A protein has these predicted regions:
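Short, proline-enriched alpha-helix->beta-strand connector loops that line the catalytic pocket
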Residues: 35, 114-120
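Solvent-exposed loop/turn segments at secondary-structure junctions
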Residues: 8-12, 44-49, 79-83, 104-108, ...
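C-terminal catalytic histidine-bearing segment of alpha/beta-hydrolase fold enzymes
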Residues: 123, 127-137, 141, 146-167
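Active-site machinery of serine-nucleophile hydrolases
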Residues: 2-56
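Short, solvent-exposed loop/turn and secondary-structure capping segments
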Residues: 13-19, 51-53, 87-88, 110-113, ...
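Primarily recognizes the serine-hydrolase "nucleophile elbow" in alpha/beta-hydrolase
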Residues: 71-114
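Gly/Ser-rich "nucleophile elbow"/oxyanion-hole loop immediately N-terminal to the catalytic nucleophile
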Residues: 47-79
Length: 167
């Protein structure tokens, strides 16, 4: 299995080598679920197309270089890293078994994600200090609408899409 975790501001490259590992515990937490899971925690240079393309290239490289089950490749994006993750989900949603978007906004196009039916779990605080909760709520509603337009049942949608808004 492979878990790719994309950092927020504190984990960007200019913050210093390894700062993403000191400021965010997503990769360490993922190992609690699967001790054999390979963790990739790149330090991005931005939250845009360049980092999205680099994330995809890194994932493809790791899949080719290591014995990783392609059905167990997961992506996580926190804060600005979630913006990058949403662009990755626009470009190559089928590369990942699921995506965890935390305290972020959705910058990518949701159509390719809906077509691929890659499961997404969105988590945000109701009063998130940077983004607020509205951006993820809006993305959730838009993606839910796309699934409804595709004829999916509520049970099928619930298997693919979760919005967890914390008080």
């Amino acid at each position: 299995a492979l878990f790719v975790t994309l950092p927020g501001y504190e984990g960007l490259y200019f913050q210093g080598v390894g700062s993403n590992l000191r400021s965010e515990a997503f990769g360490f937490e993922a190992q609690q679920y699967n001790a054999q899971m390979l963790i990739a925690a790149p330090q991005l240079g931005d939250w845009g197309e360049t980092s999205a393309d680099q994330t995809i290239a890194l994932t493809e490289y790791l899949l080719s270089a290591y014995n990783i089950d392609p059905q167990k490749v997961y992506l996580n994006g926190y804060s600005g890293g979630g913006e990058t993750g949403s662009l990755v989900m626009e470009k190559r949603p089928q590369l990942y078994a699921a995506y965890l978007a935390v305290s972020t906004q959705w910058d990518g196009d949701l159509q390719p994600l809906a077509a691929a039916r890659t499961p997404v779990y969105m988590a945000v605080g109701e009063e998130d200090s940077y983004y607020g909760s509205e951006p993820l709520k809006s993305a959730y509603e838009e993606l839910r609408g796309l699934y409804m337009d595709m004829g999916l049942t509520q049970a099928q949608i619930n298997d693919l899409l979760v919005l967890d808004v914390k008080d």
